[in-house]
Amino acid sequence: MKKIVLIAIVIGMWPTLYGQQIMTTNGGAPIGDNQNSKTVGEYGPVLLEDIHLIEKLAAFDRERIPERVVHARGAGAFGYFESTKDMSSYTKAVLFNGNNKRTDLAVRFSTVIHGKGSPETARDPRGFAVKFYTQQGNYDIVGNNLPIFFIRDAIKFPDMVHSLKPSPVTNKQDPNRFFDFFSNVPEATHMITRLYTDLGIPKGYQYMNGSSVHGFKWVNENGEVTYVKYSWISKQGEHNLDLEQAAKQQSVDWQHATVSLRMDIDNKNYPQWDLYVQLIKPKDIGSFDFWPLDATKDWPADKIEKIKIGTMTLNKNPVNYFQEVESIAMSPGNLIPGIEPSEDKLLQGRLFSYFDTQRHRLGANNQQIKVNQPKKEVVNYNSDSYSSASNSKFPNADINYQPSTKVALKENSSYKLSETKLNNIKITQKKISKTNDFAQPGSFYRSLSEKDKTNLIRNLKGDLGQVKNIHIQKKMITYFYRSDRDFGMRIAKALGFSQKDFMQFGK
Protein backbone atom coordinates (compact mmCIF):
# COMPACT_ATOMS: atom_id res chain seq x y z
CA MET A 1 0.00 0.00 0.00
CA LYS A 2 2.87 2.36 0.85
CA LYS A 3 4.44 1.67 -2.55
CA ILE A 4 1.19 2.54 -4.35
CA VAL A 5 0.87 5.85 -2.47
CA LEU A 6 4.51 6.72 -3.27
CA ILE A 7 3.98 6.06 -6.98
CA ALA A 8 0.87 8.26 -6.96
CA ILE A 9 2.77 11.09 -5.31
CA VAL A 10 5.63 10.86 -7.82
CA ILE A 11 3.20 10.83 -10.74
CA GLY A 12 1.37 13.85 -9.30
CA MET A 13 4.68 15.72 -8.96
CA TRP A 14 5.89 14.79 -12.47
CA PRO A 15 5.20 18.19 -14.14
CA THR A 16 7.02 19.97 -11.32
CA LEU A 17 9.92 17.57 -11.14
CA TYR A 18 10.70 17.80 -14.82
CA GLY A 19 9.68 21.40 -15.46
CA GLN A 20 6.79 20.42 -17.71
CA GLN A 21 3.56 22.37 -17.95
CA ILE A 22 0.14 20.77 -18.04
CA MET A 23 -1.50 21.15 -21.45
CA THR A 24 -4.83 23.00 -21.37
CA THR A 25 -7.79 23.76 -23.60
CA ASN A 26 -8.23 27.28 -24.94
CA GLY A 27 -10.47 27.83 -21.93
CA GLY A 28 -7.67 26.89 -19.54
CA ALA A 29 -8.97 23.47 -18.46
CA PRO A 30 -6.31 20.71 -18.11
CA ILE A 31 -6.25 18.06 -20.87
CA GLY A 32 -6.17 14.40 -19.92
CA ASP A 33 -5.31 12.82 -23.30
CA ASN A 34 -4.01 14.62 -26.39
CA GLN A 35 -3.23 11.42 -28.32
CA ASN A 36 -6.57 9.59 -28.53
CA SER A 37 -10.05 10.76 -29.49
CA LYS A 38 -13.11 9.83 -27.44
CA THR A 39 -14.83 6.92 -29.22
CA VAL A 40 -17.64 4.39 -28.99
CA GLY A 41 -15.60 1.32 -28.17
CA GLU A 42 -11.97 0.80 -29.05
CA TYR A 43 -12.37 1.23 -32.81
CA GLY A 44 -14.87 4.10 -32.99
CA PRO A 45 -16.70 5.97 -34.34
CA VAL A 46 -15.59 9.24 -32.72
CA LEU A 47 -18.01 11.14 -30.50
CA LEU A 48 -18.92 14.74 -31.29
CA GLU A 49 -18.84 15.43 -27.55
CA ASP A 50 -15.02 15.20 -27.59
CA ILE A 51 -14.72 18.95 -27.03
CA HIS A 52 -10.92 18.94 -27.05
CA LEU A 53 -10.80 17.22 -30.46
CA ILE A 54 -13.34 19.64 -31.97
CA GLU A 55 -11.59 22.68 -30.51
CA LYS A 56 -8.19 21.47 -31.70
CA LEU A 57 -9.39 20.86 -35.27
CA ALA A 58 -11.32 24.14 -35.39
CA ALA A 59 -8.25 26.07 -34.27
CA PHE A 60 -6.09 24.28 -36.84
CA ASP A 61 -8.59 25.02 -39.62
CA ARG A 62 -8.21 28.73 -38.90
CA GLU A 63 -4.45 28.90 -38.34
CA ARG A 64 -3.63 30.47 -41.67
CA ILE A 65 -4.53 34.10 -42.23
CA PRO A 66 -4.41 35.58 -45.75
CA GLU A 67 -0.83 36.15 -46.82
CA ARG A 68 0.24 39.57 -48.02
CA VAL A 69 -0.77 40.11 -51.65
CA VAL A 70 2.78 41.42 -52.16
CA HIS A 71 5.80 41.17 -49.84
CA ALA A 72 4.57 37.82 -48.50
CA ARG A 73 8.04 36.34 -47.91
CA GLY A 74 9.83 38.24 -45.18
CA ALA A 75 12.13 38.34 -42.17
CA GLY A 76 12.06 40.67 -39.19
CA ALA A 77 14.10 41.97 -36.29
CA PHE A 78 14.03 44.55 -33.53
CA GLY A 79 16.44 47.24 -32.46
CA TYR A 80 16.78 50.97 -32.06
CA PHE A 81 17.48 54.19 -33.94
CA GLU A 82 19.91 56.71 -32.48
CA SER A 83 19.82 60.25 -33.84
CA THR A 84 23.14 61.96 -34.51
CA LYS A 85 21.94 65.34 -35.80
CA ASP A 86 19.27 67.70 -34.52
CA MET A 87 16.79 68.31 -37.35
CA SER A 88 14.28 70.36 -35.33
CA SER A 89 14.71 73.34 -37.65
CA TYR A 90 13.05 71.19 -40.35
CA THR A 91 10.68 68.89 -38.43
CA LYS A 92 9.00 68.66 -35.05
CA ALA A 93 9.05 64.84 -35.27
CA VAL A 94 10.24 63.71 -31.84
CA LEU A 95 12.70 61.07 -33.03
CA PHE A 96 14.66 63.60 -35.14
CA ASN A 97 14.70 66.64 -32.83
CA GLY A 98 17.83 65.99 -30.79
CA ASN A 99 21.26 64.34 -30.71
CA ASN A 100 21.85 60.85 -29.25
CA LYS A 101 18.12 60.21 -28.96
CA ARG A 102 17.13 56.52 -28.97
CA THR A 103 13.89 55.22 -30.44
CA ASP A 104 12.89 51.55 -30.37
CA LEU A 105 11.94 50.04 -33.71
CA ALA A 106 10.94 46.94 -35.63
CA VAL A 107 12.04 46.07 -39.16
CA ARG A 108 10.61 43.77 -41.80
CA PHE A 109 12.59 42.89 -44.93
CA SER A 110 10.89 41.04 -47.75
CA THR A 111 10.76 39.92 -51.34
CA VAL A 112 7.82 41.24 -53.34
CA ILE A 113 6.05 39.04 -55.88
CA HIS A 114 6.07 35.42 -54.78
CA GLY A 115 4.50 33.61 -51.81
CA LYS A 116 5.63 32.99 -48.23
CA GLY A 117 7.55 29.83 -49.14
CA SER A 118 9.35 31.22 -52.20
CA PRO A 119 13.15 31.36 -52.61
CA GLU A 120 15.08 34.42 -51.46
CA THR A 121 17.34 34.02 -54.49
CA ALA A 122 14.75 35.33 -56.97
CA ARG A 123 15.29 38.57 -58.87
CA ASP A 124 12.88 40.89 -57.14
CA PRO A 125 12.84 44.24 -55.35
CA ARG A 126 13.26 43.87 -51.59
CA GLY A 127 10.96 45.51 -49.10
CA PHE A 128 12.66 47.61 -46.42
CA ALA A 129 10.08 48.66 -43.81
CA VAL A 130 10.82 50.25 -40.43
CA LYS A 131 8.36 50.92 -37.60
CA PHE A 132 9.53 53.49 -35.03
CA TYR A 133 7.85 53.32 -31.61
CA THR A 134 7.99 57.04 -30.73
CA GLN A 135 6.50 58.90 -27.77
CA GLN A 136 3.98 60.50 -30.14
CA GLY A 137 2.82 57.32 -31.84
CA ASN A 138 4.13 54.84 -34.38
CA TYR A 139 5.93 56.13 -37.45
CA ASP A 140 6.56 53.79 -40.40
CA ILE A 141 8.99 54.25 -43.30
CA VAL A 142 7.77 51.62 -45.76
CA GLY A 143 10.22 51.47 -48.65
CA ASN A 144 12.40 49.22 -50.79
CA ASN A 145 16.06 48.45 -51.31
CA LEU A 146 15.96 50.45 -54.57
CA PRO A 147 15.31 54.23 -54.45
CA ILE A 148 12.59 54.21 -57.13
CA PHE A 149 9.60 52.20 -58.36
CA PHE A 150 8.09 50.90 -61.61
CA ILE A 151 5.15 53.31 -61.77
CA ARG A 152 4.26 56.82 -60.65
CA ASP A 153 0.48 56.49 -60.20
CA ALA A 154 -1.28 54.07 -57.83
CA ILE A 155 -4.02 53.43 -60.38
CA LYS A 156 -1.55 51.21 -62.27
CA PHE A 157 -0.48 49.22 -59.22
CA PRO A 158 -3.00 46.33 -59.37
CA ASP A 159 -2.28 45.83 -63.09
CA MET A 160 1.48 45.90 -62.56
CA VAL A 161 1.26 43.28 -59.80
CA HIS A 162 -1.08 41.12 -61.89
CA SER A 163 1.47 41.13 -64.74
CA LEU A 164 4.31 40.13 -62.42
CA LYS A 165 2.35 37.45 -60.57
CA PRO A 166 2.01 33.95 -62.07
CA SER A 167 -0.43 33.61 -64.95
CA PRO A 168 -4.01 32.84 -63.85
CA VAL A 169 -4.00 30.13 -66.55
CA THR A 170 -0.63 28.42 -66.12
CA ASN A 171 0.29 29.57 -62.57
CA LYS A 172 3.77 30.43 -63.90
CA GLN A 173 5.49 33.79 -63.76
CA ASP A 174 5.93 34.69 -67.40
CA PRO A 175 8.20 37.35 -68.97
CA ASN A 176 5.74 37.51 -71.87
CA ARG A 177 3.20 38.95 -69.45
CA PHE A 178 5.24 41.45 -67.48
CA PHE A 179 7.22 42.75 -70.47
CA ASP A 180 3.92 43.14 -72.31
CA PHE A 181 2.88 45.45 -69.48
CA PHE A 182 6.20 47.29 -69.15
CA SER A 183 6.52 47.83 -72.91
CA ASN A 184 3.51 50.12 -72.53
CA VAL A 185 4.87 51.84 -69.41
CA PRO A 186 8.08 53.70 -70.36
CA GLU A 187 8.34 55.16 -66.85
CA ALA A 188 9.32 51.65 -65.66
CA THR A 189 12.61 51.75 -67.63
CA HIS A 190 14.57 53.15 -64.69
CA MET A 191 13.41 50.49 -62.22
CA ILE A 192 13.87 47.66 -64.72
CA THR A 193 17.43 48.83 -65.41
CA ARG A 194 18.33 48.80 -61.73
CA LEU A 195 16.48 45.56 -60.98
CA TYR A 196 18.27 43.61 -63.72
CA THR A 197 21.70 44.50 -62.38
CA ASP A 198 22.99 42.36 -59.53
CA LEU A 199 21.12 44.73 -57.18
CA GLY A 200 18.10 42.57 -58.01
CA ILE A 201 19.43 39.70 -55.88
CA PRO A 202 20.95 40.96 -52.60
CA LYS A 203 23.37 38.63 -50.83
CA GLY A 204 21.38 39.12 -47.65
CA TYR A 205 19.05 41.63 -46.07
CA GLN A 206 21.85 43.16 -44.00
CA TYR A 207 23.84 43.75 -47.20
CA MET A 208 21.32 45.97 -48.96
CA ASN A 209 20.55 49.67 -48.74
CA GLY A 210 17.06 51.04 -48.31
CA SER A 211 14.97 53.98 -49.44
CA SER A 212 11.62 55.58 -48.65
CA VAL A 213 11.10 55.73 -52.46
CA HIS A 214 8.68 58.64 -51.99
CA GLY A 215 9.30 62.16 -50.86
CA PHE A 216 7.40 63.23 -47.74
CA LYS A 217 6.82 66.56 -46.02
CA TRP A 218 8.68 67.57 -42.91
CA VAL A 219 6.96 70.34 -40.92
CA ASN A 220 8.67 72.34 -38.17
CA GLU A 221 7.19 74.15 -35.15
CA ASN A 222 6.56 77.24 -37.30
CA GLY A 223 4.52 75.28 -39.84
CA GLU A 224 7.26 75.54 -42.47
CA VAL A 225 7.35 72.66 -44.95
CA THR A 226 10.39 70.90 -46.41
CA TYR A 227 10.22 67.89 -48.73
CA VAL A 228 12.31 64.95 -47.52
CA LYS A 229 13.45 61.61 -48.90
CA TYR A 230 15.11 58.93 -46.74
CA SER A 231 18.00 56.59 -47.56
CA TRP A 232 19.33 53.72 -45.44
CA ILE A 233 23.00 52.93 -46.14
CA SER A 234 24.22 49.52 -44.94
CA LYS A 235 27.31 49.65 -42.73
CA GLN A 236 27.97 46.04 -43.77
CA GLY A 237 28.43 47.22 -47.36
CA GLU A 238 26.19 46.54 -50.33
CA HIS A 239 26.73 42.99 -51.62
CA ASN A 240 24.74 41.09 -54.23
CA LEU A 241 24.65 37.76 -56.06
CA ASP A 242 25.18 37.26 -59.78
CA LEU A 243 23.35 34.51 -61.66
CA GLU A 244 25.89 31.77 -60.90
CA GLN A 245 26.14 32.72 -57.23
CA ALA A 246 22.35 32.84 -56.90
CA ALA A 247 21.97 29.41 -58.52
CA LYS A 248 24.64 27.95 -56.24
CA GLN A 249 23.07 29.53 -53.16
CA GLN A 250 19.62 28.24 -54.09
CA SER A 251 20.96 24.70 -54.40
CA VAL A 252 22.34 24.91 -50.85
CA ASP A 253 19.77 27.04 -48.99
CA TRP A 254 17.10 29.13 -50.69
CA GLN A 255 16.12 30.92 -47.46
CA HIS A 256 19.64 32.18 -46.90
CA ALA A 257 18.70 35.82 -46.29
CA THR A 258 16.43 34.97 -43.36
CA VAL A 259 18.98 32.57 -41.89
CA SER A 260 21.91 34.97 -42.33
CA LEU A 261 20.11 37.88 -40.65
CA ARG A 262 19.06 35.77 -37.70
CA MET A 263 22.50 34.21 -37.24
CA ASP A 264 24.26 37.57 -37.28
CA ILE A 265 21.99 38.89 -34.54
CA ASP A 266 22.30 35.67 -32.50
CA ASN A 267 26.09 35.95 -32.81
CA LYS A 268 25.95 39.62 -31.72
CA ASN A 269 27.13 40.84 -35.12
CA TYR A 270 24.40 43.44 -35.01
CA PRO A 271 23.58 44.87 -38.46
CA GLN A 272 23.56 48.66 -38.76
CA TRP A 273 22.37 51.21 -41.28
CA ASP A 274 23.03 54.95 -41.37
CA LEU A 275 19.97 57.07 -42.14
CA TYR A 276 20.41 59.93 -44.60
CA VAL A 277 17.89 62.53 -45.71
CA GLN A 278 17.70 64.79 -48.75
CA LEU A 279 15.77 68.03 -48.43
CA ILE A 280 14.02 70.27 -50.97
CA LYS A 281 12.25 73.54 -50.21
CA PRO A 282 8.78 73.83 -51.81
CA LYS A 283 9.92 76.85 -53.83
CA ASP A 284 12.62 74.66 -55.45
CA ILE A 285 10.49 71.60 -56.18
CA GLY A 286 9.97 72.59 -59.82
CA SER A 287 13.57 73.58 -60.55
CA PHE A 288 14.79 70.13 -61.64
CA ASP A 289 14.57 68.42 -65.02
CA PHE A 290 12.38 65.80 -63.32
CA TRP A 291 9.49 65.96 -60.86
CA PRO A 292 10.91 64.98 -57.42
CA LEU A 293 7.52 63.64 -56.27
CA ASP A 294 7.55 61.08 -59.09
CA ALA A 295 8.32 57.66 -57.56
CA THR A 296 10.20 56.58 -60.71
CA LYS A 297 12.86 59.24 -60.04
CA ASP A 298 15.89 59.20 -57.77
CA TRP A 299 17.09 62.39 -56.09
CA PRO A 300 20.69 62.67 -57.36
CA ALA A 301 23.15 63.23 -54.51
CA ASP A 302 25.21 65.63 -56.63
CA LYS A 303 22.17 67.93 -56.89
CA ILE A 304 20.46 67.28 -53.54
CA GLU A 305 22.86 66.70 -50.64
CA LYS A 306 22.54 63.60 -48.47
CA ILE A 307 22.68 64.45 -44.76
CA LYS A 308 23.34 61.76 -42.15
CA ILE A 309 20.91 62.05 -39.23
CA GLY A 310 21.31 58.78 -37.32
CA THR A 311 21.99 55.06 -37.21
CA MET A 312 19.74 52.01 -36.91
CA THR A 313 20.97 48.92 -35.05
CA LEU A 314 19.19 45.54 -35.06
CA ASN A 315 19.99 43.58 -31.90
CA LYS A 316 17.02 41.30 -31.17
CA ASN A 317 15.44 38.44 -33.10
CA PRO A 318 11.74 37.62 -33.01
CA VAL A 319 10.70 35.00 -30.46
CA ASN A 320 7.49 34.11 -32.29
CA TYR A 321 7.52 34.68 -36.06
CA PHE A 322 3.75 34.79 -36.50
CA GLN A 323 3.10 37.23 -33.68
CA GLU A 324 6.04 39.54 -34.33
CA VAL A 325 6.74 39.41 -38.08
CA GLU A 326 3.76 37.94 -39.91
CA SER A 327 1.40 40.07 -37.80
CA ILE A 328 3.28 43.35 -38.07
CA ALA A 329 1.22 45.96 -39.92
CA MET A 330 3.33 48.55 -41.73
CA SER A 331 1.79 51.53 -43.50
CA PRO A 332 3.13 54.78 -45.00
CA GLY A 333 0.02 56.30 -43.41
CA ASN A 334 1.42 55.72 -39.90
CA LEU A 335 2.69 59.27 -39.42
CA ILE A 336 3.44 61.47 -36.41
CA PRO A 337 3.41 65.25 -35.89
CA GLY A 338 6.07 66.86 -38.06
CA ILE A 339 5.77 64.35 -40.92
CA GLU A 340 3.07 64.45 -43.58
CA PRO A 341 2.45 62.79 -46.96
CA SER A 342 3.52 64.58 -50.11
CA GLU A 343 1.51 64.91 -53.31
CA ASP A 344 3.24 61.84 -54.83
CA LYS A 345 0.48 60.01 -56.77
CA LEU A 346 1.76 56.53 -55.90
CA LEU A 347 2.11 57.41 -52.23
CA GLN A 348 -1.42 58.81 -52.14
CA GLY A 349 -2.80 55.40 -53.16
CA ARG A 350 -0.60 53.54 -50.68
CA LEU A 351 -1.96 55.65 -47.82
CA PHE A 352 -5.30 53.88 -48.29
CA SER A 353 -4.21 50.49 -49.57
CA TYR A 354 -1.88 49.51 -46.72
CA PHE A 355 -4.40 50.21 -43.96
CA ASP A 356 -7.07 48.45 -46.00
CA THR A 357 -5.04 45.29 -46.59
CA GLN A 358 -4.14 45.08 -42.88
CA ARG A 359 -7.81 45.19 -41.96
CA HIS A 360 -8.43 42.38 -44.45
CA ARG A 361 -5.41 40.31 -43.45
CA LEU A 362 -5.25 40.84 -39.69
CA GLY A 363 -8.74 42.06 -38.82
CA ALA A 364 -10.24 45.24 -37.45
CA ASN A 365 -8.20 45.05 -34.24
CA ASN A 366 -4.81 44.77 -35.99
CA GLN A 367 -3.44 47.83 -34.19
CA GLN A 368 -4.05 46.09 -30.85
CA ILE A 369 -1.68 43.25 -31.78
CA LYS A 370 1.31 43.72 -29.50
CA VAL A 371 3.88 44.39 -32.23
CA ASN A 372 1.61 47.10 -33.66
CA GLN A 373 0.72 48.81 -30.40
CA PRO A 374 2.15 52.29 -29.92
CA LYS A 375 4.01 53.19 -26.75
CA LYS A 376 1.78 56.22 -26.49
CA GLU A 377 -1.58 55.51 -24.84
CA VAL A 378 -4.38 55.38 -27.42
CA VAL A 379 -7.24 57.69 -26.39
CA ASN A 380 -10.13 58.44 -28.77
CA TYR A 381 -13.85 57.95 -29.24
CA ASN A 382 -13.80 54.66 -31.14
CA SER A 383 -16.62 52.79 -29.48
CA ASP A 384 -18.00 49.26 -29.10
CA SER A 385 -15.59 47.53 -31.46
CA TYR A 386 -12.25 45.76 -31.51
CA SER A 387 -10.59 49.11 -32.24
CA SER A 388 -12.20 50.93 -29.31
CA ALA A 389 -10.26 52.49 -26.48
CA SER A 390 -11.13 51.68 -22.88
CA ASN A 391 -13.58 54.21 -21.46
CA SER A 392 -11.86 53.90 -18.09
CA LYS A 393 -9.20 56.23 -19.51
CA PHE A 394 -11.70 59.08 -19.86
CA PRO A 395 -12.43 61.69 -17.17
CA ASN A 396 -16.12 61.38 -18.19
CA ALA A 397 -16.70 57.78 -19.24
CA ASP A 398 -20.24 58.49 -20.42
CA ILE A 399 -19.00 60.89 -23.12
CA ASN A 400 -17.87 59.13 -26.31
CA TYR A 401 -18.67 61.91 -28.77
CA GLN A 402 -17.76 65.46 -29.73
CA PRO A 403 -18.72 68.25 -29.38
CA SER A 404 -20.00 68.06 -25.83
CA THR A 405 -20.61 70.45 -22.92
CA LYS A 406 -18.62 68.00 -20.82
CA VAL A 407 -15.04 67.98 -22.05
CA ALA A 408 -13.76 64.42 -21.88
CA LEU A 409 -11.00 64.71 -24.47
CA LYS A 410 -9.51 67.70 -26.22
CA GLU A 411 -7.33 68.35 -29.24
CA ASN A 412 -4.03 70.23 -29.28
CA SER A 413 -3.95 72.83 -32.04
CA SER A 414 -0.14 72.71 -32.18
CA TYR A 415 -0.50 69.33 -33.91
CA LYS A 416 -2.75 70.58 -36.72
CA LEU A 417 -1.62 69.67 -40.22
CA SER A 418 0.22 72.17 -42.40
CA GLU A 419 -1.64 74.33 -44.89
CA THR A 420 -1.01 74.51 -48.63
CA LYS A 421 -2.13 77.45 -50.73
CA LEU A 422 -3.23 76.66 -54.28
CA ASN A 423 -3.64 79.21 -57.06
CA ASN A 424 -5.12 78.61 -60.50
CA ILE A 425 -5.18 74.83 -60.01
CA LYS A 426 -7.82 72.69 -61.68
CA ILE A 427 -8.93 69.16 -60.91
CA THR A 428 -7.69 66.90 -63.71
CA GLN A 429 -6.97 63.30 -64.68
CA LYS A 430 -3.81 63.03 -66.76
CA LYS A 431 -0.17 62.06 -66.42
CA ILE A 432 2.41 64.61 -65.36
CA SER A 433 4.02 66.69 -68.09
CA LYS A 434 7.59 66.41 -66.78
CA THR A 435 8.00 62.65 -67.32
CA ASN A 436 11.66 62.53 -68.48
CA ASP A 437 11.58 58.73 -68.35
CA PHE A 438 14.98 57.98 -69.86
CA ALA A 439 17.55 60.45 -68.47
CA GLN A 440 18.01 58.75 -65.09
CA PRO A 441 18.23 55.15 -66.35
CA GLY A 442 20.85 56.38 -68.81
CA SER A 443 22.87 58.08 -66.07
CA PHE A 444 22.61 54.97 -63.92
CA TYR A 445 23.77 52.74 -66.78
CA ARG A 446 26.81 54.94 -67.43
CA SER A 447 27.74 54.80 -63.74
CA LEU A 448 28.07 51.00 -63.84
CA SER A 449 31.37 49.17 -64.13
CA GLU A 450 31.95 47.11 -67.25
CA LYS A 451 31.31 43.94 -65.27
CA ASP A 452 27.99 45.31 -64.00
CA LYS A 453 26.98 46.34 -67.53
CA THR A 454 27.78 42.87 -68.82
CA ASN A 455 25.71 41.26 -66.06
CA LEU A 456 22.83 43.65 -66.74
CA ILE A 457 22.72 42.73 -70.44
CA ARG A 458 22.97 39.02 -69.65
CA ASN A 459 20.21 39.20 -67.03
CA LEU A 460 17.89 41.14 -69.34
CA LYS A 461 18.57 38.75 -72.20
CA GLY A 462 17.56 35.83 -69.99
CA ASP A 463 14.02 37.16 -69.47
CA LEU A 464 13.45 39.46 -72.46
CA GLY A 465 14.76 36.68 -74.70
CA GLN A 466 11.79 34.51 -73.65
CA VAL A 467 9.30 37.05 -75.01
CA LYS A 468 7.69 35.66 -78.15
CA ASN A 469 6.31 38.94 -79.48
CA ILE A 470 9.08 40.71 -81.40
CA HIS A 471 7.27 44.06 -81.16
CA ILE A 472 7.40 43.90 -77.36
CA GLN A 473 11.14 43.19 -77.53
CA LYS A 474 11.64 46.11 -79.91
CA LYS A 475 9.72 48.53 -77.71
CA MET A 476 11.79 47.57 -74.67
CA ILE A 477 15.03 47.94 -76.62
CA THR A 478 13.84 51.35 -77.81
CA TYR A 479 13.44 52.45 -74.20
CA PHE A 480 16.96 51.24 -73.36
CA TYR A 481 18.35 52.93 -76.47
CA ARG A 482 16.68 56.22 -75.58
CA SER A 483 18.25 55.93 -72.14
CA ASP A 484 21.74 55.26 -73.49
CA ARG A 485 22.83 54.36 -77.02
CA ASP A 486 25.36 51.75 -75.88
CA PHE A 487 22.78 50.19 -73.56
CA GLY A 488 20.25 49.79 -76.37
CA MET A 489 22.77 48.50 -78.89
CA ARG A 490 24.15 45.88 -76.54
CA ILE A 491 20.78 44.43 -75.57
CA ALA A 492 19.66 44.49 -79.22
CA LYS A 493 22.74 42.54 -80.25
CA ALA A 494 22.26 40.10 -77.36
CA LEU A 495 18.73 39.39 -78.59
CA GLY A 496 19.93 38.74 -82.14
CA PHE A 497 18.84 41.91 -83.91
CA SER A 498 20.98 43.20 -86.75
CA GLN A 499 22.44 46.70 -86.82
CA LYS A 500 19.97 47.61 -89.57
CA ASP A 501 16.99 46.40 -87.54
CA PHE A 502 18.22 48.18 -84.50
CA MET A 503 18.85 51.56 -86.11
CA GLN A 504 15.40 51.42 -87.68
CA PHE A 505 13.44 51.03 -84.46
CA GLY A 506 15.95 52.72 -82.20
CA LYS A 507 15.30 56.21 -83.53
What are these regions (language model features)?
Residues 15-19:
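Sec/Tat signal peptide C-region and signal peptidase I cleavage site
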Residues 20-507:
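Active-site-adjacent core segments of small-molecule enzymes
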